[in-house]
Amino acid sequence: MLNAVDAKLTTDFGQR
């Protein structure tokens, strides 16, 4: 669960 959230957050940060 945390992995998925971390991946999403990382992607969001990377895109931003």
Curated annotation (Swiss-Prot):
GO cellular component entries: photosystem II; plasma membrane-derived thylakoid membrane
Topology in the lipid bilayer: Peripheral membrane protein
GO BP, sorted A to Z: photosynthesis
Subcellular location field: Cellular thylakoid membrane
Keyword vocabulary terms for this entry: Electron transport, Membrane, Photosynthesis, Photosystem II, Thylakoid, Transport
Source organism, top-level taxon: Bacteria
Broad class of the protein's primary localization: membrane
Free-text function comment from the UniProt entry: One of the extrinsic, lumenal subunits of photosystem II (PSII). PSII is a light-driven water plastoquinone oxidoreductase, using light energy to abstract electrons from H(2)O, generating a proton gradient subsequently used for ATP formation. The extrinsic proteins stabilize the structure of photosystem II oxygen-evolving complex (OEC), the ion environment of oxygen evolution and protect the OEC against heat-induced inactivation.
Official protein name in the record: Photosystem II extrinsic protein U
Originating organism: Synechocystis sp. (strain PCC 6714) (Aphanocapsa sp. (strain PCC 6714))
Higher taxonomy: Bacteria, Bacillati, Cyanobacteriota, Cyanophyceae, Synechococcales
